[in-house]
Amino acid sequence: MINGWTGNILRINLTTGAIS
């Protein structure tokens, strides 16, 4: 659960960084 949650945040962070 924690692993998936962290992965989700990292994915969002990478996506946001890529868009920005």
Curated annotation (Swiss-Prot):
Chief location category: membrane
Alphabetized UniProt keyword annotations: 4Fe-4S, Cell membrane, Iron, Iron-sulfur, Membrane, Metal-binding, Molybdenum, Oxidoreductase
Record GO cellular component, one term: plasma membrane
EC numbers on record: 1.1.99.30
Protein name: 2-oxo-acid reductase
Molecular function GO terms recorded: 2-oxo-acid reductase activity; 4 iron, 4 sulfur cluster binding; molybdenum ion binding; molybdopterin cofactor binding
Function of the molecule: Oxidoreductase with an extremely broad substrate specificity that can reduce reversibly 2-oxocarboxylates to (2R)-hydroxycarboxylates.
Annotated localization: Cell membrane
Cofactor note (record): Binds 1 [4Fe-4S] cluster per subunit. Binds 1 Mo-molybdopterin (Mo-MPT) cofactor per subunit.
Disulfide bonds: none
Activity regulation information from UniProt: Is inhibited by cyanide. Is sensitive to oxygen.
Catalytic activity: a (2R)-2-hydroxycarboxylate + A = a 2-oxocarboxylate + AH2
Family stated for the protein in its record: Belongs to the AOR/FOR family.
Subunit structure: Forms various types of homooligomers.
Cofactor(s) the protein needs: [4Fe-4S] cluster; Mo-molybdopterin
